[in-house]
Amino acid sequence: VAGLSLMTLRAQMFSERQNQTRHLIETATTLVDHYAQAVRDGALSDDAGRKAALAAVSSLRYSDGEYFFVLDHAGTVVAHGVDPRLVGKNLKEAKDQNGVAFVAQMLEGARSPDGVTVRYVWPKGKGSPEPMPKIAFAKRHPGWDWIIGSGVYVDDFDRAFVVAALQMAGTSLVVILLLGTAASLLGRAIV
């Protein structure tokens, strides 16, 4: 029972993280929609609308410095929230250390109206060269044929799961001890 509970807990925690990322992409997509509508209304030129949308998405942050990125349909970075040096580079062939072609997966999966979740590993930052597990969600914005995405590291997810598992184990142990004590006392009372 405890094993099944732990598997269910892990799946639930992962699903919550996935949904959080999905909702954040929906927010960024709505922001881009605002600028696309301004272009359709004639308030902005197409070029000005695109630049404003990319600047707005690039400036968005959440959680612990997580950011958004925008790719064109071919995999070229058109905006990146933390590394502007990537803008203009085609990352379609990029792979993580395990050989996962994560950008190609995003490009392919983002064609779905629901978007796509991709799992891969990537260095967490300049101070941490070791690749860490990450999940990203990406969705196509049809107006400008952009792929809007963001990824979150899940190393903290593993730590949170271990803490929850230990709490569950502790609770189970207390329940077992109480039931054992009650059974022992009941057995003595009957004899």
Where are these regions (language model features)?
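Extracytoplasmic
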Residues: 87, 97-163
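Membrane-interface helix-start motif
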Residues: 13, 154-175
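Extreme N-terminal signal-anchor transmembrane helix of membrane signaling/transducer proteins, especially
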Residues: 1-8, 168-186
